[in-house]
Structures are given as structure tokens and as C-alpha cells.
Amino acid sequence: MPPRSPLLALVFLAAGVLSSATSPPPPPCSRSCAALNCDSVGIRYGKYCGVGWSGCDGEEPCDDLDACCRDHDHCVDKKGLMSVKCHEKFKNCMRKVKKAGKIGFSRKCPYEMAMATMTSGMDMAIMLSQLGTQKLEL
């Protein structure tokens, strides 16, 4: 029997699109540090982290993890949301932040929790990006 993970990924993607269609639109950009939904796909961390969220041009990141998110935002703006290289660079940036042993700006949303959530999100994005570039045989 063929693996069902591509079908499952499409179901999750469709669910995400539908849920985002019913939620209010995000503000145009963020000027304040946020720490919301840290253990879910709807995470908001710092000014730049989270699907659909970004800091305003020229805004300093809240911490090193938020800087990784800013750099990822810039990368996907240039190369597109399907850029696996952007997602891999983001994961590498998070690994460096973790290795440095610093503490983030939020006690409510510690690095360990936020990074685990973001890593899962990037793994899903990489899988969907790769799925979108493969030729399917019928």
C-alpha cells in the first residue's frame, strides 16, 4: 500500500488555509514583542516569528531567535515560500541560537518551546515544498 503522508500533508495544509480564512487579518507589521500560542502552529514570537506576521521595516528583533525569523522573512520574500534553502537556513540559525545558550526575551515562551514549534513548522514547510516540486505518477 502506498504511503499516505502526502495526502495527510494536503489535509493539514487545507485545514490551515481554512482556519486562516476565518481568522482576522494580521496587522500590516509589528512594532512590539509578542509571545502567543508558543506551542501551536499559530505561534507569534517577537516581531517577526509566526505565519503571516512580520516586523515593520527597520524594527530591531526582540532577540536572537526573532532575528532568525526576520532573516527567514527576507529570504522567502526574495526566493518564495517554497524555498527549501530558506527553511533550512532558518533551522540552522535556530540551532546556532540554541547552541549559544542565551535566554530569549519571554519567560512565557522560552526558546526551547518556541524553537520546537518553529522546527515542526519548518519541517512541514520543507515537506510541502518538496511535494510541490515532485512529479506525481498516476
Swiss-Prot record:
Sorted alphabetically, which CDD domains does this protein's record hold?
A: PLA2_plant
How the cofactor binds, per note? Binds 1 Ca(2+) ion per subunit.
A GO term, aspect molecular function: calcium ion binding
Q: Briefly, what is this protein's role?
A: PA2 catalyzes the calcium-dependent hydrolysis of the 2-acyl groups in 3-sn-phosphoglycerides. Releases lysophospholipids (LPLs) and free fatty acids (FFAs) from membrane phospholipids in response to hormones and other external stimuli.
Binding-site residues for Ca(2+), renumbered to this chain: 48, 50, 53, 73
Q: What is its EC number?
A: 3.1.1.4
Q: Where is the active site?
A: 72
UniProt lists the family membership as follows: Belongs to the phospholipase A2 family.
GO CC annotations?
extracellular region
Q: Which domain of life is it from?
A: Eukaryota
Q: Where in the cell is it found?
A: Secreted
What is the protein's name according to its record? Probable phospholipase A2 homolog 1
Q: Provide a GO biological process annotation.
A: lipid catabolic process
Query: Cross-referenced InterPro entries, in alphabetical order?
Result: PLipase_A2_dom_sf (IPR036444), PLipase_A2_His_AS (IPR033113)
Catalytic reaction list: a 1,2-diacyl-sn-glycero-3-phosphocholine + H2O = a 1-acyl-sn-glycero-3-phosphocholine + a fatty acid + H(+)
Q: List the disulfide bonds.
A: 29-56, 33-62, 38-109, 49-69, 68-93, 75-86
Task: Check the UniProt entry and state the signal peptide residues, or none.
Answer: 1-21
Q: Which gene encodes it?
A: PLA2-I
Recite the UniProt keywords alphabetically. Calcium, Disulfide bond, Hydrolase, Lipid degradation, Lipid metabolism, Metal-binding, Secreted, Signal
Cofactor(s) listed in the protein's UniProt record: Ca(2+)
